[in-house]
Amino acid sequence: MGVVTYDMEIPSKIPPTKLFKAFIIDGDNLVPKVLPHAIKCVKILEGDGCAGTIKEVTFGEGSHHKCVKQRVDAIDKDNLTYSYTIIEGDVLADKFESISYHIKIVACPDGGSICKNRSIYTTKGDCKVSEEEIKLGKEKASEIFKALEAYLLANPDYC
């Protein structure tokens, strides 16, 4: 078993609290609305949205994958942090035990924010994570983030 970690930062014009509410708190409803080709729906299978909650994410027709189950590991609305782990699904295939994400949204002096994301891939056996897989993961995350940002900019009264 191996562990591969990468960090990514995405700047945004959206203030941190509004971005956290849209991306994390309302994300299960907003992402499928804004990007139905990427995410078809998100269902809570167990829990109330707090730590320990299990969600099923069904991907849209534009995705190479069908669905995943993810566990909410932590959510802190005051510090604008959120952590979750993919625990099941075809994304993991025979290569990964799990994939964890740790997100923190911080304020910028210009009134916007930066979304800091740490991704941790825990591999099965001697499997390796290629640079191409990391690049694709970053591109997908950036696509979703930028689409949500564009939606919020076009709909300033949201949240």
Language model features with spans:
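C-terminal helix/juxtamembrane-tail motif
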Residues: 1-2, 106, 132-159
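Beta-strand/loop substructures that line and gate deep hydrophobic ligand-binding cavities in soluble
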Residues: 83-143
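Hydrophobic pocket/interface hotspot
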Residues: 19-23, 55, 72, 115-117
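Short, intrinsically disordered, mixed-charge
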Residues: 21-29, 77, 146, 150-154
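Hydrophobic ligand-binding cavity/cleft-lining segments
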Residues: 1-50
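Glycine-rich portal/gate segments that line the openings of hydrophobic small-molecule binding cavities
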Residues: 30, 40-94, 155
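Coil-to-beta-strand transition motifs
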Residues: 3, 63-65, 79, 110-114
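Hydrophobic/aromatic beta-strand elements that line small-molecule binding cavities or substrate pockets
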Residues: 8-10, 68-74, 99-107
